[in-house]
Structures are given as C-alpha cells and as structure tokens.
C-alpha cells in the first residue's frame, strides 16, 4: 500500500501588544515581585451542553490549589475575577484590525469574545477570552505566499512562579490580561 502524502505544517504565533491590558486599564509591564497573594481552587462546571469537561474534572481531582500574587499598577479586580471585564481595549482591537488588513485577511463582520476553558490555574476565572478577528490572510515571503488562516485577539495567561511540594502553584497576575 503506497500512498503519496505531502508534508503540511502549521505554526501558531503569539505577539504581546504594547498597550494597556485587554479588559481593564491596568499597565501591561511585568513586575519583579508580587505584593500580597490569595488562594483559589478552581472547580469544574457543567457546560451549556450539560457535560463536564474531562480535563477540568481531572485537574480538580488532583486537589491542586493556586496562589496568585498581585503587582501594583498591573492588577485590579478584573484579574482577580472579582469584577466583570470592562470594554475591550480599543488600541488592542485597532492593532489587530490593522494587522489583519495588512495580511489582506477577511475581517469578521461582528467580533465576539469566546471563553476557552483553562484548567491549569493560569487564569483566575478558569477560562481565557479570545476573539476571532479575521480569516484567510497571507504574507509574501520571497516568491512564496504563506497562508494565514486566522488572526485572533486574546488575553495572555498569568505567569507561573513556582510549584510547591503539595502541588500548589504560585502565579503572578502581572501578565494576565495582556493582549
């Protein structure tokens, strides 16, 4: 049985934007030390389809706990998941739209932020907010046209600082929410 296959490879590229955070007006620089911390244990919930995510359930059953450090000027109640997200950062949205135009991509008519489940504790809410901005773009590299399937705008995760012997993970919230 001989079949002819062609190699195809994809790459996902992330670029932090030099703006305020995506859903609040906090600065987006990283700090060297955290001031204060709080503990959280994330629990799995039933989806709108009536099912519990198996990965979230397995992480919960490990009895893992998460401790989060705050940083002055880079953390507010939005990162702590104690306040709803504010309106999307217009500078970050404009950068994503401009980049999409530069790629000749098809910008989505109505942009909505989706919630992707995150079970490792790197987001205090248990999910990451991501928006599909555009599809079907391309970039010319020499004599080749490289397809760009999608452009998304999303918030970055918290930084893992350490893991204790008890499987408790310490995250710093300065990076959480950077577009």
Residue ranges and their predicted role:
Residues 1-179:
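Basic, nucleic-acid-interacting segments
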């Amino acid at each position: 049985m001989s079949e002819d296959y062609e190699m195809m490879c994809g790459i996902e590229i992330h670029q932090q934007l030099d703006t305020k955070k995506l859903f609040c007006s906090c600065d987006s620089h990283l700090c060297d030390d955290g001031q204060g911390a709080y503990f959280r244990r994330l629990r799995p919930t039933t989806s709108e389809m009536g099912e519990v995510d198996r990965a979230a359930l397995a992480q919960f059953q490990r009895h893992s706990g998460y401790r989060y450090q705050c940083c002055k000027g880079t953390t507010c109640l939005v990162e702590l998941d104690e306040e709803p997200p504010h309106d999307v950062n217009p500078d970050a949205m404009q950068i994503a739209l401009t980049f999409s135009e530069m790629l000749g991509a098809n910008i989505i008519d109505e942009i909505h932020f989706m919630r992707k489940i995150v079970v490792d504790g790197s987001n205090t809410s248990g999910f990451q907010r991501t928006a599909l901005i555009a599809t079907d773009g391309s970039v010319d590299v020499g004599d080749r046209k490289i397809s760009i399937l999608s452009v998304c705008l999303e918030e970055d995760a918290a930084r893992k600082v350490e893991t204790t012997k008890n499987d408790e993970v310490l995250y710093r919230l300065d990076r959480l929410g950077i577009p």
